[in-house]
Amino acid sequence: MNNKLSNAPIYDEKWIERLAITIFDDIAVLTKDRHGVSRETYGKGETDAINYLSKLAVKLGLYVEVDDAANVFFSSKPIVNSRYMLIGSHMDSVPLGGNFDGLAGVLAGFLILSYLSKNKINLSLPLKVIALRGEESAWYGRNYIGSKSIFGLLTKEDLNSTHRKTGEKLSKAMQSCGVHINKIQSSISLIDKENIELFIELHIEQGPILVDRNWPAAIVTGIRGNNRHHNIICKGSAGHSGTIPRYLRKDAVFAGADLITRMDDHWNTIQQHGGDLVLTSGIFHTDSDHHAMSRIPGEIFFSFESRSQDVATLDALEALLKSECKTIERERGVKFEFDDLIKSSPAELDEVIIKNLLDAGESLGFERASLPSGAGHDAAVFANVGIKTGMIFVRNDKGSHNPYEAMDIKDFMAGLSILKKFIIDY
């Protein structure tokens, strides 16, 4: 046997899996924090991870290009004035987050592209992979920054939003990463969306359903939109806890708790009537400089988020929130002050893509598993500008947005194999 041939690398599923493990491990070390990883939106961790992939792409013989929003594209060769398929996800993480949120989707596309290139497999249309910046809202209170930039959708308010700790404006952070901020400010689309045949995003499931149903992977049927208030203030009147009777109190904590309880009742009613809805108040606190065991709290600060696949449900919840606040103001003598509402629209995914992804999975021996996405994703931006879009979820134990994300590499390979077959068969 020819020694050169026998020693030649075999670019198969095992090669993909080995490379996947190496990349996941390397980026985890590169972006590690005191717990988990931190890949800050338009910050060091996100940039380091993108640079790692870009250098590896060159070694693998792939073509790398960077757009004016510092998103990075990978392809087997330059694609000019031609329709193409696009796979991708985001490279940032929440502070002290897990290693697989976002990265799994970028890496799935990256590995499929590398596999196709090494094996010289021709497709009906060229394939690009995108590593998106800034999907997480945890850093600047704004989500989908990279994907919105692509389509000229970032607003002045978005660009003026400030970092959760440093107070730095998003626009400045973007410039420091090489973004051509003038183009972003002018709301110019950075690519011709008519050239994008479809967009597919693989992502870890960030809830417990795949684990509960023992599905290694599943196809997403739709993406919930959300309404978000990052900082609502309830103002009452501080006082001595022992001297003021209930009927004279203006207790901000009790007023806030009353509001959350009422909204929970509305949530329950809507669900009983078949509506799709989840509500969360993830931030709820008094002022640490003033709170005390024996002090009636005069002020609280809290967030409020509603998510649904139905815009009418989101609008109804916002109206109910404001209405209940007015009622509680009258009953408890407090005042609610609202910040600006931030909206993300629900997204309908392409029915043909959903069916073809299910068919691809079934042909590989997987159950025809599907579910809606409760979390928002970059895929929603692509879908809502009219691009045919699909999503694949991969099983992930121990939740997400925490350091304990536990995606098994075999489950990742299951999702990747479905995506790879879909792309090859398209």
Task: Give the ranges of each region predicted by the language model.
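N-terminal capping segment at the start of a domain
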Residues: 2-43, 133, 158-159, 400-401
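A short beta-alpha structural unit
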Residues: 11, 38-42, 278-289, 308-309, ...
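Zn-dependent metallopeptidase/amidohydrolase metal-coordination segment
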Residues: 12, 23-26, 88-89, 298, ...
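A non-catalytic alpha/beta surface segment that caps or lines the substrate-entry region
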Residues: 31-77
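Catalytic-core environment of secreted peptidases
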Residues: 56, 60, 72-104, 109, ...
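Alpha-helical metal-binding/catalytic segments enriched in His/Glu/Asp
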Residues: 87, 96-136, 228-234, 243-267, ...
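His/Asp/Glu-rich mid-to-C-terminal helical/loop segments that flank catalytic regions of hydrolases
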Residues: 224, 240-270, 318, 322-323, ...
